[in-house]
Regions:
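Conserved N-terminal segment of class I S-adenosyl-L-methionine
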Residues: 1-102, 113-120, 125, 156-157, ...
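Short "lid" loop at the C-terminus of a central beta-strand within the Rossmann-like core
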Residues: 137-141, 153, 176-180
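Acceptor-substrate binding/catalytic loop of class I
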Residues: 143-162
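C-terminal lobe and adjacent flexible extensions of AdoMet/dcAdoMet transferase-like proteins
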Residues: 207-213
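C-terminal alpha-helical "lid/dimerization" subdomain adjacent to the S-adenosyl-L-methionine
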Residues: 164-165, 170-183
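Hydrophobic adenine-recognition pocket in adenosine-nucleotide-binding enzymes
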Residues: 106-109, 138
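A short acidic, helix-capping loop that chelates divalent metal ions and anchors anionic groups
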Residues: 84-86, 141-146
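Conserved beta-strand signature within the Rossmann-like core of class I S-adenosyl-L-methionine
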Residues: 129-136
């Protein structure tokens, strides 16, 4: 684990500068490419026989889809919930490295500083050139964030800036939204103008793909 001096190296001025740069690349949430599911993004990042770690894996649903749709991928999980079977129950137990790590709907449950520390810790579990895929509730959605156990809200430019502050290079930022065909069609192709006017978004999550240098 990181010592206190390492934790204190975070710079708010650098974070704000990173956030500004992300805003230049993606001036609004509507500039983010829309994907149906997190799995679509993860699958696009897996290159053959790679190892993936799912942090906060819960029911291992992502692994079920990977095993069904992809071949040669080694899928492992880490979750603090011992009621479910996982490969690891603490990051400190992990003594191997991975090509891809997924952190899905986890970071909003801890404080901002804990989030930065977590991102830095995950970087140590990635190979050079490894990808970290982070999803978090989309703050432009009217009610997506407001669960009682959520602690830290992140706008898309903030979660991306946090990753840069933790030493990653941001490669892509996406929104995810999936629904019944007709409802999705109407929202994506007919109601988008109204969402933009009201500054709200129907996409439930923001997903950032970042790379370890």
């Amino acid at each position: 684990m990181q010592n206190q001096s390492e934790k204190n190296t975070f710079s708010w001025s650098e974070f704000y500068a990173h956030r500004k740069e992300i805003r230049k690349l993606y001036p609004s949430v509507y500039k983010l490419a829309l994907k149906k599911k997190l799995f679509d993004i993860v699958a696009a990042e897996l290159r053959g026989k790679e190892k993936i770690l799912d942090v906060g894996a819960s029911t291992r649903r992502l692994g079920e889809r990977i095993n069904k749709k992809l071949s040669g991928v080694t899928y492992k999980t880490m979750d603090i919930d011992r009621a479910k079977k996982h490969d690891y129950y603490s990051l400190d137990e992990i003594k191997e490295t991975f090509d891809v790590i997924v952190l899905s709907e986890v970071i909003e449950h801890i404080s901002f500083q804990e989030g930065i520390d977590l991102l830095k810790r995950l970087a140590t579990l990635l190979v050079s050139g490894g990808r970290l895929i982070v999803s978090t509730p989309n703050l432009h959605h009217p009610n997506r964030y407001w669960d009682s156990d959520h602690k830290t809200p992140y706008r898309y430019e903030e979660i991306a800036a946090a990753l840069v502050s933790a030493g990653f290079n941001v490669r892509n930022i996406y929104r995810t939204y999936n629904d019944r065909y007709l409802r999705r069609f109407v929202r994506v192709y007919f109601m988008a103008w109204l969402h933009r006017y009201l500054d709200v978004d129907f996409a439930k999550s923001v997903v950032v793909v970042a790379e370890k240098p």
